[in-house]
Amino acid sequence: MKFLPSLEEVKKIAHEQIYNVLPVSTEMLSDFTTPIEVMRVLKNVSSHCFMLESAQADEKWGRYTFIGFEPKMEITCIDGILNLGDITVNTNQPSKYLRQILANYKSPRFDYLPSFTGGLVGYFSYDYITYSEPSAKRETENNEAFKDVDLMLFDKVIAFDSVKQKIILMANIHLENYEVEYNRAVNELKQLAELLHNGEKIKEKSGKLLGDVKPYFNKEQYCEMVEKAKNYIREGDIFQIVLSNRLSANFEGSLFNTYRVLRTLNPSPYMFYFSGTDVEVAGASPETLVKLENGVLRTFPLAGTRPRGKTEEEDKLLEKELLADEKELAEHNMLVDLGRNDLGRISKFGTVEVEKLHSIERYSHVMHIGSTVRGIIREDKDALDAIEAVLPAGTLSGAPKIRACQLIGELENNKRGIYGGAIGYIDFTGNMDTCIAIRIAYKKNGKVFVRSGAGIVADSVPEKEFEECLNKAKSCLKALEIAQEVD
């Protein structure tokens, strides 16, 4: 096996004293297994794991699948109580401690490696806004004790390269004692290669729904909530607000098979499976929250929807109709402005621009109007600042954002948790890629939850908005149903 970089190259980087970690890597052919099979092997070793995949708008599978297991630590925060492995701290600034952790893991980028080589993986919940904007906080019911943050630190990563048909194994080393660390990483990677070839796969029961799926708000309650929101809109408090409803059912077993089904039912730019201490998440989200790559910030507002046509001709007619819909365009433009304002808070003056406006993005079942907003991050800001500036997305809150969040707390009166938050990674090079936590199923305390929302404006019809929430939940509910029969 060949290992990169060489020990001589590591020595040189260590002596420069710019970085304190770097990834040692090796490669193997991938023709003997699949990412799903590898996950089954790793889940037998560690219940704490993740899988990140991608499918493009034309349903072509993305190049890389990232897998991690055996995290160095799990970091959670709920209502200002931060757990860093075995340490507990009271804080109203979780990002301060996350920054301290990441400061111990500053890595160079290597052109021969994929975009993610190790870092923090997990989620920032919708309610994380209360740390950066305390005025948005409202006392809401949280019987399920949903965390505000749940991240795991992975210094070992497996990447499947679907183009070159190979697996890249990566283990990060600390440069302080680089020779000992290098030898440790080489041995670790050899053992990992052996595990992938010969490891035993987990024998897991398919997840089972126990009883009916029930909404948090029945139709009458949800419609009443919509009418209250429309009053706030008429009074000029807000222009738009996104009101959500939560579906839940008792559940036993794992969500891994649900993820396997969901990725085939709903191929999406962001597909993820995440298993922590007390939560499991399976999702397929179409929408980026915020991305930071080599100092460039991007957010991709996505709003305005039509179903996909049965033929290319019908697709083009629906595209034309969507781009001529003034109401859809007005709503989309409001979100583009919100994206510019959000990035403007952390970007260098004069660098925020709309890179792409009103393009049609096609997905497996629907098409959306998409735009791209770009900015250059300021030297004194980082990925954590970007998350605080953008979370939650306007498509999951409303406009103006802070007032919409305050009213969501009052009207919904139950903690959203993961839904509407950010799922993804912050890596050891300072880059970040996060999606909006929608089209997800998550399991906690013997229950499974699926949540979805509808954008409320002045002329919204409450009954239609209730139905829209149910329609948006369909792909996850269908995946839960089908997964019960999957081996």
Spans of model-derived segments:
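Extended alpha-helical targeting/anchoring segments
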Residues: 1-487
